[in-house]
């Protein structure tokens, strides 16, 4: 044997003229099984094109050697030499995981369908509208006329308690029918007009009371007005300017 032969391949009793075969020296016990988690990145199954993933550049373009492709060997159906691909991306193919009879702890990489891998979740326009509304200008709080209406209702109730009560009061208060409510309104208006002749003779229930809204200045408006006033009244003294010195020199020369 040559000197470059590894030590574990050198036979102890080496006789001249006799050649040893590797299968006589090596034994299956010398090959250790994979330790821990084992993942294979290249796989060629029985289905051929529909059961292949990983880098199959070692085929060197001989894709007809794949099982199931001996009859139909077309280079256009296969990718280039140095491309990584997973052929199980078609929706028609069904991937069936079969455990390896030799390697018990071999785990295949998960299959990702092409329709699932290329489809992205659609972004609804509602999300964009909500974002635009959030970044929009702040809206001023709305002024409601509910307190004014409550005060008017309390005044009317106090006046009705002090005044004379007619038969139409109960019907108007319970809101029974349209005719009874109209009679109650007439009785209320007549009783109030008798007690308070200075009031205008109009039906108070038909005309809604106007909302007395007084819009006061908010804190932001007051701070803004103070800021603008301070900026307008700001006076900066930068000292004597160069133009003044030039004019003074010109006056002296004259």
Swiss-Prot record:
Q: Phosphotyrosine is carried by which residues?
A: 63
Q: Which Pfam families match?
A: BORG_CEP, PBD
Gene Ontology terms describing biological process: positive regulation of actin filament polymerization; positive regulation of pseudopodium assembly; regulation of cell shape; Rho protein signal transduction; signal transduction
Which family is it part of? Belongs to the BORG/CEP family.
Write out the coiled-coil annotation as residue ranges.
none
Tissue expression notes: Highly expressed in the heart and weakly in the brain.
Q: What is this protein called?
A: Cdc42 effector protein 3
Q: Where is the composition biased (Low complexity)?
A: 171-193
Task: Give the CRIB domain ranges.
Answer: 31-45
Keyword Phosphoprotein assigned: yes
Q: Which organism is it from?
A: Homo sapiens
Listed A to Z, the keywords are: Cell shape, Cytoplasm, Cytoskeleton, Membrane, Phosphoprotein
Q: Where is this region: Disordered?
A: 164-225
- One example GO MF annotation: cytoskeletal regulatory protein binding
Q: Can the keyword Phosphoprotein be found in this entry's annotation? A: yes
Task: Give the sites modified to Phosphoserine.
Answer: 89, 108, 144
The subunit structure is:
Interacts with RHOQ and CDC42, in a GTP-dependent manner, and with SEPT7.
Protein's job: Probably involved in the organization of the actin cytoskeleton. May act downstream of CDC42 to induce actin filament assembly leading to cell shape changes. Induces pseudopodia formation in fibroblasts.
PANTHER family per the record? CDC42 EFFECTOR PROTEIN 3, CDC42 EFFECTOR PROTEIN BORG
